[in-house]
Amino acid sequence: MGFDSPRGRGGGGFRGGRGGGSGFTPRGGGGGFRGGDRGRSPGGFRGGDRGRSSSGFRGGDRGRSPGGFRGDREGGFSPRGRGGGFRGGDRGGFRGGDRGGSPWRGGDRGNFRGGDRGGSPWRGGDRGVANRGRGDFSGGSRGGNKFSPRGGGRGGFTPRGRGGNDFSPRGGRGNFQSRGGGSRVGFSDKRKQYDSDGDDDEEEEVPKKKLATGTPFAKQTKPVEDDSGEDEEDEEESDEEPQPPKKTAKSAIATAAEDSDDDEEDDDEEEEESDDDAPQVKKSVAVEEDEEDEEDEEEIEMDEEDEEEEEDEEETEPVAKTPAVKSSLKSVDSTKGKQVNLSKVATPTTVDKKAPATPHPAKTSKNAAGDVPKLNFDDDSDEEDEEDEEVEEEDEEEEEEEEDVPAKKAPVLKQSLSQIAQAIEEDSDDEDEDEEEEEDEEDEEEEEDTTNVPLIKSKADLLKQIAANRAAASAAQDSDEDEDEEDEEDVEEEDEEEEEEEDIPAVKPKVTEKQGGVKRKLDEPTVASKQVKSDGKSIISEEERRRQDRDSRSLFIKEIAKKAKDAEITGLVTGLDSFRRKKNSNFGWLVFNTVADCKKAHDVLSKSKIQGKALYVDFCLSESKAPKEHGVRPINPLQLFINALPGTCNNTDLKNIFRSSTDIKILHASGQPNSKKRAFITFGTVEDAQAAFAKSNGLKVNNHLVDVFYARHQETKVDVKPKKAATPAVQKKIVPKVAADSSGDDSEEVASSDEGIQEVEEEQPKQKKLVKKVEPKTIPRVQQKKPQFKKTGFKGKK
């Protein structure tokens, strides 16, 4: 549209989206102006563009334009100025005497070097006003100031300094984009690096074909063209007829790298970038030529590049892919490796044969076969959008993998299979640990429900519980000491009856499993209860008679010293059958063989002292009360209860006595191995149980008289029994935890809890009050200790 842009093909000075596009270059004309790229002026046309005048024609054809005086090479205008006024960015405005000759050059690459070797002052990489830290806006390159972090004067605000001056992170995506910063040919790397969009096509073709073939490229050279209007004709012909690309000799390459001393400093920095952008074949040929030859070579190279670009447009337009698509696959730094230095590598022969460019292997599947990519990259946001889309595609793929692997919690980009497996194992381990913790918590909650043991989470809670236990134990002991003789006898008898009722639920299943007809016999006492009631009455009366017989031969004593041993008491009397005393208890019962022995012992013990303390002694028969209480609960017709078994008795001894029994269970009265034992004898039939009960009158086991009674059912105590079981369990489980603090009081607490089971239940509200009173006493102590531990801990860490 107007101005002759070698690659634009319309677009009115804009880089034209590759053949009549909307005026925006897909690779670097992002801001709308190719501005200074390949020597074009900031206005969007090439500033004379090889001699064209500002109106878009070749204005003097290499220097014949109004502003393009060929000058004398010393007078401020480049002798090969190519028109456009002040070289129009073609190698910098005010070439300034060409390498320091003019006052502006100043010999120090100073004021108006004016984009020398790099286009207009806006062109990043020119060595003029904003170039290489010698201008106003150059960043950190060679002491420059202002905004360019990498410096080199390669644009106003680009972090890498690769061209455009509009905040482009990659350079070459902003306005006045120059892919190769610091090159002497407008916006090309090292004067030869940047090849605009046609070069982009070559970037796809050349390296990939080289990888495919693995053969060196054929080298072609082109004779130097004259500075006449032939350039215009050549370029016009090249639009119609593709010509083979041509290259200069190796000596031209060497002279470009070995410039004057001042130029070498600038070139070194440019070479550092060009080395990062593309691997180059370094050749050392020590040849120095005139500066005019260098300019001629540059012009020839630019002509060749333009011709190659035009040929590439005709050849590879249908299948061309923009580097932006490729660059979206890579990071910002990785795209530098995809640039191709066409001046260092010969053009492949396949280009002449019009072979289609090899598409990018990673992205071929994303474009349909018949689709021609129409891309419009205005700025970096387009490229970033593509990168975001690729990241989203990767996320979607990983989310699909997550569906196959439910243990994975969050998508992770670019995660290997080993990492995924590792994450799954960790997650599964975490889930297993969580399940184990939940099971442990459930078990603990069940234990708490059964035992009602409060959780001890801190030292304060432990102290509170200790105080509560001691208060309960002391209350039980006080109540025991204040009891009368009658109450103590009732407690003992009730303990026996309670133990008679134990394990009955476990006995019933065993009986039903072993004998099929037993179930009916068990039901008969409740259904047809005539004989059972008559038997029950006789049983109760028989049990009462046996108790009276036992009590007539027994003495009740109390106020026994806790440290006194049983032998100290039994050694004072004769005819003793058994001494029933709980460990370290201050009371007990002496059972004698005959009533006469009991009376003699009463006289002796009432006058005796144990460890300096007198005993309280009395008969049990006259003190026995409420015989009806023993007949309130229904009996178990299949089970007998035996009390006061000697410590040496075992299951074999009882089995020899009760041969018709089906199950024998021996219990220790107070949980101590050497204490008096109690047993439950289960029979298969009611007749067997009745026969065993009848024969057990005056029964001796290991030469000790024992009491034999019927066991009782638990039906009437279903609601009361759990409370009794819960109270001792609370105290017994907490006492071992306190053992480290008060080992001497353990036995006392256990004994007192067993002795006063019913009293503790009745006085539970009182115990709660005691616990509440103890709390304010224990809390201040714990609060005083905690700060001390913290202070010492901090000191140790410091």
Curated annotation (Swiss-Prot):
Keywords: Nucleus, RNA-binding. Identified in an mRNP granule complex containing untranslated mRNAs. The keyword Cytoplasm does not apply. It comes from Caenorhabditis elegans. InterPro entries: Nucleotide-bd_a/b_plait_sf, RBD_domain_sf, RRM_dom, RRM_MRD1_RNA_proc_ribogen. Residues 638-713 form the RRM domain. GO terms for molecular function: RNA binding. Residues 8-34, 150-164, 171-184 have a biased composition (Gly residues). Residues 783-798 have a biased composition (Basic residues). This is Nucleolin homolog 1. Residues 328-350 have a biased composition (Polar residues). It holds the Pfam family RRM_1. Residues 1-548, 736-798 are annotated as: Disordered. Residues 196-205, 226-242, 258-278, 287-317, 378-404, 424-450, 478-504, 743-762 have a biased composition (Acidic residues). Residues 467-476 have a biased composition (Low complexity). It is found in: Nucleus, Nucleolus. The lineage of its organism: Eukaryota, Metazoa, Ecdysozoa, Nematoda, Chromadorea.
